[in-house]
Amino acid sequence: MISADEEYTAKKNRKKQKRVILQMAILVVIATVFYLALFTVGKYKPYEPTAINMAQDKGFIALSYFGVDRVGQQPLISEDRLAEHLAALRKQGYVTITQKDIKDFYEAGKPLPARALFLMFEDGRRDTAIFSTSQIEKYNYKATMATYPENFAKRDTKFLKPRELKSLVDTSFWELGTNGYRLSFINVFDRYNNYLGELTPLEYAMISPYLGRRYNHYLMDYIRDEHGVPKESYEMMKARLDYDYQKLSDDYREGIGSVPQLYVLM
């Protein structure tokens, strides 16, 4: 005879098993959609040397998007609007350049195409890769996907994982960059000048309608109190920053085998 406790435990275990199976099924669907979205039939072709006109070399423009989804919920851009942007750029004769092109331009004076475009997407979102790759391939553009390696270990399907980032690079239409190890805000005040201190990205997003412009990226300043007085010494700040840069390097090397050459703070 089964006791009430045993029956309850068995019922609870069955529910847990169903939940695990459902979660695994969702992950499989997400992975399938992602890899189908990355299916490309061509390879990126660098711009032709004839695109370079020494007399018209005026550097390049950099265009960065926070992210892309199907409908364009703020702060993301929609798939259709991105298609309009890229089509307009292509019509005006813009060709994309790579991170190496930029480095050679500044360090060796290598000329760039008359209409050179550096294209980047921030935050390392999975939906960005899904909804933008086909458009990038369509116009033979090359883009950089910037990520936060702190997200590699999180069980959050919103962000790209190392294996997926490698798949992006394999398409030849993507390069990798970084926005830093993580995103965090310090010395935050709301628009009424109330001191809030330090905020995570989630906390920041939840109260963003009530925030002004008084805040700092956590790598850009001392952590300060409401009077602007540092709450840490120079040595403490340096140790905090050193730890962050070391974690960035370690996680990228472990996840994708190397550290991206492009670093952009949001």
What are these regions (language model features)?
Residues 21-42:
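Hydrophobic membrane-insertion alpha-helices, especially the h-region
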Residues 40-59:
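Ser/Thr/Pro/Gly-rich low-complexity linker/stalk segments immediately outside membranes or between
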Residues 66-69, 115-117, 137-266:
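Metal-dependent polysaccharide deacetylase catalytic core of the NodB/CE4 family, i.e.
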Residues 1-19:
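N-terminal Lys/Arg-rich, disordered targeting/topogenic segments
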Residues 69-75, 129:
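Short, solvent-exposed loop/turn elements at domain surfaces
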